[in-house]
């Protein structure tokens, strides 16, 4: 299973900005910040991230009622947090408040240090799962930006920085797209289809997650089956299946849905939410951070006699400059934008926010001793679910088990 996302913020201004050429390292968090960054506990950051995740999901789902939805709230929020480093006053407050931070209870410094430690932890190599996340600034070559902004993006967000000539739009576009393609292993080959020659700076954030199921599906068991788009339409899909699987499960009768957790090797898991036929909108409208917490807290190991899950690969492409104002981020897109902590003057505004995500789900996984032991140890549990069939639209949430941060959230309405 692989999840890949990239987000690009395109900034235009009267006077272009530049950053000295160079690669900014991943291990340069100043020593004096090491202790302070932990003031914002990872679980606190995760709960805030969940609130933003669900708000954005509802906007995207409303705009795309019958379409697949997939996005990375962590990638989007990290990019916006970096942008807020360069913003002042009400421009900054808008961004952080939409990210669900209460600025009367937490300082701006704590927010950025919390993000910094989270991203630094995720960038550490892990035996079982591949996680690659990072940010990059592409700056026009005409004029320096403030060294303080350069230092903070490097230290807190591990951002790389490159010089680009945006007067040569096609060359600059290829430069940025090639970088993103390389970081996402070719999964996102073209983040930008076009660039404006007035562009002064592009901020890119990417997240690549490759996880292997703790208990994999056997490819030999995959078969062709119906997936019901609605009550009248269906499509043929490759359907994976596995029998006698012991995994966390809950039936939510109040919201008319079943919730299943599948674990990856390593420190991540996927929550699959299967609404009853015709109940998708009811479940979506009821989604709150408390809902996800209730499901997580109520999950109990159950034996699924047979689990069926479609094999699929879907991709999405969003222009978030149309969505973020609906959530409350407006000033960065206007001439009233104050991004003066980037350049020293109020000469920048955001003209484009592009987010692309790719979600691949297949049988891949590796059987390990721990998985076999867990399955065997829990066989004595009395409750058995006869058949759980994901043959209609469903949602999924991919989280980091250590900090509960949401890597990806999506809705699959058509696997093909």
From Swiss-Prot:
One of its GO terms (molecular function) is serine-type endopeptidase inhibitor activity. GO terms for biological process: response to cytokine. Its main location: secreted. It holds the Pfam family Serpin. Keywords: Glycoprotein, Protease inhibitor, Secreted, Serine protease inhibitor, Signal. Binds to and inhibits kallikreins. Inhibits trypsin but not chymotrypsin or elastase. This is Serine protease inhibitor A3K. It comes from Rattus norvegicus.
């Amino acid at each position: 299973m692989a999840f890949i996302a990239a987000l690009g913020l395109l900034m235009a201004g009267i006077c272009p900005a530049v950053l000295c050429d160079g690669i900014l390292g991943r291990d340069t968090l100043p020593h004096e910040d090491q202790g302070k960054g932990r003031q914002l506990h990872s679980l606190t950051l995760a709960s805030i991230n969940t609130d933003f995740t669900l708000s954005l999901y509802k906007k995207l789902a409303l705009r795309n009622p019958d379409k697949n939805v997939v996005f990375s709230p962590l990638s989007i929020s990290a990019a916006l947090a970096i942008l807020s480093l360069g913003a002042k006053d009400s421009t900054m407050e808008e961004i952080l408040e939409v990210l669900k931070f209460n600025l009367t209870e937490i300082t701006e410094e704590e927010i950025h240090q919390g993000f910094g430690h989270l991203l630094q932890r995720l960038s550490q190599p892990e035996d079982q799962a591949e996680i690659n996340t990072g940010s990059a600034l592409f700056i026009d070559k005409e004029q320096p930006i403030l060294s303080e902004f350069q230092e903070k993006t490097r230290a807190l967000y591990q951002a790389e920085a490159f010089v680009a000539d945006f007067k040569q739009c096609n060359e600059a576009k290829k430069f940025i797209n090639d970088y993103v393609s390389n970081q996402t292993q070719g999964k996102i080959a073209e983040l930008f289809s076009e660039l404006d020659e007035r562009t002064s700076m592009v901020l890119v954030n990417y997240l690549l997650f490759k996880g292997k199921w703790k208990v994999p599906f056997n490819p030999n068991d995959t078969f062709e089956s119906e997936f019901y788009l609605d009550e009248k339409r269906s499509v043929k899909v490759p359907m994976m299946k596995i029998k006698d699987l012991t995994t966390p499960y809950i039936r939510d009768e109040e919201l008319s849905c079943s919730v299943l957790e599948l674990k990856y090797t390593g420190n991540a898991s996927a929550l699959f939410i299967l609404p009853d036929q015709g109940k998708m909108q009811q479940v979506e409208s009821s989604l709150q951070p408390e809902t996800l917490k209730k499901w997580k807290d109520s999950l109990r190991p159950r034996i699924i006699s047979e689990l069926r899950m479609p094999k699929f690969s879907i991709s999405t492409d969003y222009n978030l400059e149309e969505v973020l104002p609906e959530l409350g981020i407006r000033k960065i897109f206007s001439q009233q934008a104050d991004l003066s902590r980037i350049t020293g003057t109020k000469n920048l505004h955001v003209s484009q926010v592009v987010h692309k995500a790719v979600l691949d789900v297949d049988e891949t996984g590796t059987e390990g001793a721990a998985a076999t032991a867990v399955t065997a140890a829990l066989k004595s549990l009395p409750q058995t679910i006869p058949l759980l069939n994901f043959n209609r639209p469903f949602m999924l949430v991919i989280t980091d088990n250590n900090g509960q941060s949401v890597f990806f959230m999506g809705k699959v309405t058509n696997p093909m």
